[in-house]
Amino acid sequence: MDLISSLSLGELALSFSRVPLFPVFDLSYFIVSIIYLKYEPGSVELSRRHPVASWLCAMLHCFGSYILADLLLGEPIIDYFSNSSSILLASGVWYLIFFCPLDLFYKCVCFLPVKLIFVAMKEVVRVRKIAVGIHHAHHYHHGWFIMIATGWVKGSGVALLSNLEQLLRGVWKPETNEILHMSFPTKASLYGAILFTLQQTRWLPVSKASLIFVFTMFMVSCKVFLTATHSHSSPFDVLEGYICPVLFGATWGGDHHHDNHGAPHGMGLGTQHSGLPAKAKEELSEGFRKKKTKKAD
Protein backbone atom coordinates (compact mmCIF):
# COMPACT_ATOMS: atom_id res chain seq x y z
CA MET A 1 0.00 0.00 0.00
CA ASP A 2 3.06 2.28 0.12
CA LEU A 3 2.93 2.30 -3.66
CA ILE A 4 -0.67 3.50 -3.58
CA SER A 5 0.24 6.26 -1.15
CA SER A 6 3.22 7.35 -3.24
CA LEU A 7 0.97 7.62 -6.29
CA SER A 8 -1.50 9.75 -4.33
CA LEU A 9 -4.12 7.06 -4.78
CA GLY A 10 -4.76 6.87 -1.07
CA GLU A 11 -6.67 10.14 -1.11
CA LEU A 12 -8.45 9.07 -4.28
CA ALA A 13 -9.54 5.81 -2.67
CA LEU A 14 -10.76 7.63 0.42
CA SER A 15 -12.74 10.12 -1.65
CA PHE A 16 -14.14 7.32 -3.79
CA SER A 17 -15.35 5.39 -0.74
CA ARG A 18 -17.25 8.47 0.45
CA VAL A 19 -19.16 9.07 -2.79
CA PRO A 20 -22.91 8.82 -2.02
CA LEU A 21 -24.72 6.05 -3.86
CA PHE A 22 -28.16 7.64 -3.91
CA PRO A 23 -29.58 8.55 -6.34
CA VAL A 24 -27.22 8.14 -9.32
CA PHE A 25 -25.54 4.83 -8.52
CA ASP A 26 -28.70 3.32 -7.04
CA LEU A 27 -30.58 4.34 -10.17
CA SER A 28 -28.05 2.48 -12.31
CA TYR A 29 -28.33 -0.54 -10.04
CA PHE A 30 -32.11 -0.58 -10.40
CA ILE A 31 -31.96 -0.15 -14.18
CA VAL A 32 -29.57 -3.05 -14.75
CA SER A 33 -31.39 -5.30 -12.27
CA ILE A 34 -34.78 -4.76 -13.90
CA ILE A 35 -33.29 -5.12 -17.39
CA TYR A 36 -32.17 -8.59 -16.36
CA LEU A 37 -35.68 -9.26 -15.09
CA LYS A 38 -37.11 -8.34 -18.49
CA TYR A 39 -34.67 -10.76 -20.12
CA GLU A 40 -36.41 -13.63 -18.32
CA PRO A 41 -38.82 -15.62 -20.55
CA GLY A 42 -42.43 -14.65 -19.94
CA SER A 43 -41.64 -11.56 -17.86
CA VAL A 44 -43.28 -9.17 -20.35
CA GLU A 45 -46.48 -11.23 -20.47
CA LEU A 46 -46.46 -11.37 -16.67
CA SER A 47 -46.26 -7.58 -16.45
CA ARG A 48 -49.36 -7.29 -18.64
CA ARG A 49 -51.45 -9.97 -16.96
CA HIS A 50 -50.22 -9.68 -13.37
CA PRO A 51 -48.55 -6.28 -12.84
CA VAL A 52 -48.45 -6.68 -9.05
CA ALA A 53 -46.49 -9.94 -9.35
CA SER A 54 -44.17 -8.28 -11.87
CA TRP A 55 -43.61 -5.35 -9.50
CA LEU A 56 -42.82 -7.73 -6.63
CA CYS A 57 -40.29 -9.53 -8.82
CA ALA A 58 -38.70 -6.18 -9.67
CA MET A 59 -38.48 -5.22 -6.00
CA LEU A 60 -36.90 -8.59 -5.26
CA HIS A 61 -34.31 -7.96 -7.97
CA CYS A 62 -33.55 -4.53 -6.53
CA PHE A 63 -33.68 -5.27 -2.79
CA GLY A 64 -33.29 -9.04 -2.49
CA SER A 65 -29.82 -8.72 -0.97
CA TYR A 66 -31.14 -6.54 1.86
CA ILE A 67 -34.04 -8.92 2.50
CA LEU A 68 -31.81 -12.00 2.69
CA ALA A 69 -29.21 -10.26 4.88
CA ASP A 70 -31.91 -9.12 7.32
CA LEU A 71 -33.27 -12.67 7.39
CA LEU A 72 -29.84 -14.06 8.29
CA LEU A 73 -29.29 -11.49 11.03
CA GLY A 74 -32.77 -11.92 12.53
CA GLU A 75 -33.94 -8.44 11.61
CA PRO A 76 -37.29 -7.48 10.01
CA ILE A 77 -37.07 -8.53 6.36
CA ILE A 78 -39.24 -5.62 5.24
CA ASP A 79 -37.18 -3.06 7.12
CA TYR A 80 -35.56 -1.69 3.96
CA PHE A 81 -38.99 -0.97 2.45
CA SER A 82 -39.26 1.90 4.91
CA ASN A 83 -36.87 3.72 2.56
CA SER A 84 -39.62 5.28 0.46
CA SER A 85 -37.26 7.17 -1.85
CA SER A 86 -35.52 4.01 -3.05
CA ILE A 87 -38.82 2.14 -3.43
CA LEU A 88 -40.33 4.93 -5.51
CA LEU A 89 -37.19 5.21 -7.64
CA ALA A 90 -37.10 1.46 -8.30
CA SER A 91 -40.84 1.43 -9.03
CA GLY A 92 -40.43 4.24 -11.54
CA VAL A 93 -37.65 2.34 -13.30
CA TRP A 94 -39.81 -0.80 -13.40
CA TYR A 95 -42.71 1.09 -14.95
CA LEU A 96 -40.55 2.77 -17.60
CA ILE A 97 -38.79 -0.44 -18.60
CA PHE A 98 -42.00 -2.47 -18.94
CA PHE A 99 -44.63 0.10 -19.92
CA CYS A 100 -42.89 3.00 -21.68
CA PRO A 101 -44.53 3.61 -25.10
CA LEU A 102 -42.66 1.92 -27.96
CA ASP A 103 -40.17 0.57 -25.39
CA LEU A 104 -38.20 3.79 -25.81
CA PHE A 105 -36.72 3.79 -22.31
CA TYR A 106 -35.78 0.11 -22.52
CA LYS A 107 -34.12 0.59 -25.92
CA CYS A 108 -32.16 3.58 -24.66
CA VAL A 109 -30.79 1.90 -21.53
CA CYS A 110 -30.02 -1.31 -23.47
CA PHE A 111 -27.92 0.56 -26.03
CA LEU A 112 -24.57 -1.11 -25.38
CA PRO A 113 -22.40 1.97 -24.60
CA VAL A 114 -25.07 3.26 -22.23
CA LYS A 115 -25.61 -0.16 -20.70
CA LEU A 116 -21.89 -0.57 -20.01
CA ILE A 117 -21.93 2.64 -17.99
CA PHE A 118 -24.85 1.39 -15.92
CA VAL A 119 -23.18 -2.01 -15.45
CA ALA A 120 -20.01 -0.33 -14.17
CA MET A 121 -22.00 1.80 -11.74
CA LYS A 122 -23.89 -1.25 -10.53
CA GLU A 123 -20.62 -2.93 -9.56
CA VAL A 124 -19.73 0.13 -7.50
CA VAL A 125 -22.93 -0.44 -5.54
CA ARG A 126 -22.25 -4.17 -5.23
CA VAL A 127 -18.81 -3.71 -3.68
CA ARG A 128 -20.08 -1.04 -1.31
CA LYS A 129 -22.90 -3.36 -0.21
CA ILE A 130 -20.41 -6.14 0.52
CA ALA A 131 -18.33 -3.81 2.68
CA VAL A 132 -21.43 -2.54 4.50
CA GLY A 133 -22.61 -6.10 5.07
CA ILE A 134 -19.30 -7.08 6.68
CA HIS A 135 -19.43 -4.01 8.91
CA HIS A 136 -23.06 -4.74 9.76
CA ALA A 137 -22.19 -8.24 11.02
CA HIS A 138 -18.99 -7.17 12.79
CA HIS A 139 -20.72 -7.15 16.18
CA TYR A 140 -20.33 -10.95 16.13
CA HIS A 141 -16.61 -10.27 16.69
CA HIS A 142 -15.03 -13.67 15.95
CA GLY A 143 -17.95 -14.95 13.87
CA TRP A 144 -16.02 -14.95 10.63
CA PHE A 145 -18.47 -17.21 8.82
CA ILE A 146 -21.38 -14.98 9.80
CA MET A 147 -19.54 -11.93 8.51
CA ILE A 148 -18.63 -13.67 5.24
CA ALA A 149 -22.18 -14.96 4.76
CA THR A 150 -23.67 -11.52 5.39
CA GLY A 151 -21.29 -9.81 3.00
CA TRP A 152 -21.87 -12.52 0.41
CA VAL A 153 -25.65 -12.20 0.42
CA LYS A 154 -25.35 -8.42 0.40
CA GLY A 155 -23.42 -8.67 -2.84
CA SER A 156 -25.34 -11.47 -4.55
CA GLY A 157 -28.58 -11.90 -2.63
CA VAL A 158 -30.66 -11.35 -5.77
CA ALA A 159 -29.06 -14.34 -7.49
CA LEU A 160 -29.33 -16.49 -4.36
CA LEU A 161 -33.07 -15.73 -4.25
CA SER A 162 -33.58 -16.58 -7.92
CA ASN A 163 -35.75 -19.61 -7.14
CA LEU A 164 -38.06 -17.50 -4.99
CA GLU A 165 -38.28 -14.92 -7.76
CA GLN A 166 -39.17 -17.69 -10.20
CA LEU A 167 -42.01 -18.79 -7.94
CA LEU A 168 -43.42 -15.27 -8.05
CA ARG A 169 -43.43 -15.57 -11.83
CA GLY A 170 -45.10 -18.97 -11.69
CA VAL A 171 -41.96 -20.83 -12.74
CA TRP A 172 -40.13 -23.58 -10.88
CA LYS A 173 -36.64 -24.51 -12.09
CA PRO A 174 -34.71 -26.07 -9.19
CA GLU A 175 -31.87 -27.01 -11.53
CA THR A 176 -31.07 -23.30 -11.91
CA ASN A 177 -30.10 -22.97 -8.24
CA GLU A 178 -27.37 -20.35 -7.95
CA ILE A 179 -25.50 -22.43 -5.36
CA LEU A 180 -25.14 -25.25 -7.91
CA HIS A 181 -24.22 -23.00 -10.83
CA MET A 182 -22.53 -19.89 -9.47
CA SER A 183 -22.19 -16.97 -11.83
CA PHE A 184 -19.22 -14.63 -11.81
CA PRO A 185 -20.89 -11.96 -9.61
CA THR A 186 -21.84 -14.59 -7.03
CA LYS A 187 -18.31 -16.02 -6.88
CA ALA A 188 -16.76 -12.57 -6.83
CA SER A 189 -19.08 -11.49 -4.02
CA LEU A 190 -18.00 -14.52 -1.99
CA TYR A 191 -14.30 -13.85 -2.53
CA GLY A 192 -14.85 -10.17 -1.86
CA ALA A 193 -16.66 -10.97 1.38
CA ILE A 194 -13.66 -13.04 2.48
CA LEU A 195 -11.27 -10.18 1.70
CA PHE A 196 -13.37 -7.59 3.51
CA THR A 197 -13.72 -9.93 6.50
CA LEU A 198 -9.95 -10.31 6.69
CA GLN A 199 -9.62 -6.54 6.50
CA GLN A 200 -12.28 -5.96 9.15
CA THR A 201 -10.58 -8.40 11.54
CA ARG A 202 -7.18 -6.79 10.83
CA TRP A 203 -5.69 -9.86 9.20
CA LEU A 204 -5.33 -7.96 5.94
CA PRO A 205 -3.16 -4.85 6.46
CA VAL A 206 -5.10 -2.65 4.05
CA SER A 207 -7.40 0.27 4.70
CA LYS A 208 -11.06 -0.30 3.92
CA ALA A 209 -11.11 2.62 1.47
CA SER A 210 -8.19 1.18 -0.50
CA LEU A 211 -9.73 -2.28 -0.58
CA ILE A 212 -13.05 -0.86 -1.77
CA PHE A 213 -11.28 1.06 -4.53
CA VAL A 214 -9.13 -1.84 -5.75
CA PHE A 215 -11.89 -4.44 -5.62
CA THR A 216 -14.32 -2.08 -7.33
CA MET A 217 -11.87 -1.53 -10.18
CA PHE A 218 -11.52 -5.30 -10.54
CA MET A 219 -15.27 -5.87 -10.57
CA VAL A 220 -15.96 -3.02 -12.97
CA SER A 221 -13.26 -4.16 -15.41
CA CYS A 222 -14.38 -7.79 -15.42
CA LYS A 223 -18.11 -7.12 -15.59
CA VAL A 224 -17.84 -4.49 -18.32
CA PHE A 225 -15.65 -6.81 -20.39
CA LEU A 226 -18.01 -9.77 -19.94
CA THR A 227 -21.03 -7.64 -20.83
CA ALA A 228 -19.35 -6.09 -23.87
CA THR A 229 -18.32 -9.50 -25.21
CA HIS A 230 -21.63 -11.16 -24.25
CA SER A 231 -19.66 -13.78 -22.35
CA HIS A 232 -21.00 -15.93 -19.52
CA SER A 233 -17.61 -17.26 -18.47
CA SER A 234 -15.81 -16.35 -15.28
CA PRO A 235 -12.27 -15.00 -14.85
CA PHE A 236 -11.94 -17.48 -11.99
CA ASP A 237 -12.43 -20.54 -14.23
CA VAL A 238 -8.75 -20.95 -15.07
CA LEU A 239 -7.63 -20.66 -11.45
CA GLU A 240 -10.37 -23.01 -10.25
CA GLY A 241 -9.38 -25.49 -12.95
CA TYR A 242 -5.97 -25.84 -11.30
CA ILE A 243 -7.02 -25.63 -7.66
CA CYS A 244 -10.11 -27.87 -7.60
CA PRO A 245 -8.29 -31.10 -8.61
CA VAL A 246 -5.73 -30.50 -5.87
CA LEU A 247 -8.17 -29.63 -3.08
CA PHE A 248 -11.17 -31.78 -3.96
CA GLY A 249 -9.63 -34.62 -5.97
CA ALA A 250 -11.82 -34.13 -9.02
CA THR A 251 -11.04 -32.98 -12.51
CA TRP A 252 -12.53 -29.72 -13.75
CA GLY A 253 -15.96 -30.37 -15.21
CA GLY A 254 -16.50 -33.44 -13.05
CA ASP A 255 -20.27 -32.98 -13.23
CA HIS A 256 -20.35 -34.83 -16.53
CA HIS A 257 -18.68 -37.82 -14.91
CA HIS A 258 -21.28 -37.72 -12.16
CA ASP A 259 -24.10 -37.60 -14.69
CA ASN A 260 -22.93 -40.87 -16.20
CA HIS A 261 -23.34 -42.59 -12.85
CA GLY A 262 -26.88 -41.30 -12.66
CA ALA A 263 -27.85 -42.69 -16.06
CA PRO A 264 -30.42 -45.50 -16.40
CA HIS A 265 -29.16 -49.03 -16.08
CA GLY A 266 -29.62 -49.81 -19.73
CA MET A 267 -27.72 -46.72 -20.73
CA GLY A 268 -24.94 -47.53 -18.29
CA LEU A 269 -24.62 -51.04 -19.74
CA GLY A 270 -24.42 -49.64 -23.24
CA THR A 271 -21.77 -47.24 -22.10
CA GLN A 272 -19.77 -50.07 -20.57
CA HIS A 273 -20.02 -52.15 -23.74
CA SER A 274 -19.05 -49.20 -25.89
CA GLY A 275 -15.80 -48.94 -23.94
CA LEU A 276 -14.85 -52.59 -24.69
CA PRO A 277 -12.61 -53.64 -27.58
CA ALA A 278 -14.27 -54.74 -30.82
CA LYS A 279 -13.32 -58.40 -30.29
CA ALA A 280 -14.83 -58.44 -26.80
CA LYS A 281 -18.02 -56.91 -28.19
CA GLU A 282 -18.26 -59.65 -30.80
CA GLU A 283 -17.78 -62.34 -28.14
CA LEU A 284 -20.48 -60.81 -25.96
CA SER A 285 -22.86 -60.58 -28.91
CA GLU A 286 -22.14 -64.16 -29.95
CA GLY A 287 -22.63 -65.42 -26.41
CA PHE A 288 -25.91 -63.55 -26.16
CA ARG A 289 -27.14 -65.09 -29.43
CA LYS A 290 -26.22 -68.62 -28.29
CA LYS A 291 -28.01 -68.09 -24.99
CA LYS A 292 -31.08 -66.83 -26.81
CA THR A 293 -31.01 -69.86 -29.17
CA LYS A 294 -30.87 -72.28 -26.22
CA LYS A 295 -33.89 -70.61 -24.66
CA ALA A 296 -35.77 -70.90 -27.94
CA ASP A 297 -34.91 -74.64 -28.15
Swiss-Prot record:
GO biological process per UniProt: cellular response to caffeine; endoplasmic reticulum organization; inorganic cation transmembrane transport; potassium ion transmembrane transport; regulation of cardiac muscle contraction by regulation of the release of sequestered calcium ion; regulation of release of sequestered calcium ion into cytosol; release of sequestered calcium ion into cytosol by sarcoplasmic reticulum
Name of the protein: Trimeric intracellular cation channel type A
Lumenal topological domain residue ranges: 1-18, 73-85, 165-177, 230-233
Alphabetical keyword list: Calcium, Ion channel, Ion transport, Membrane, Metal-binding, Nucleus, Potassium, Potassium channel, Potassium transport, Sarcoplasmic reticulum, Transmembrane, Transmembrane helix, Transport
Record's bilayer topology term: Multi-pass membrane protein
Quaternary structure, from the entry: Homotrimer; conformation seems to be controled by binding to diacylglycerol (DAG).
Family, per entry: Belongs to the TMEM38 family.
Organism: Rattus norvegicus
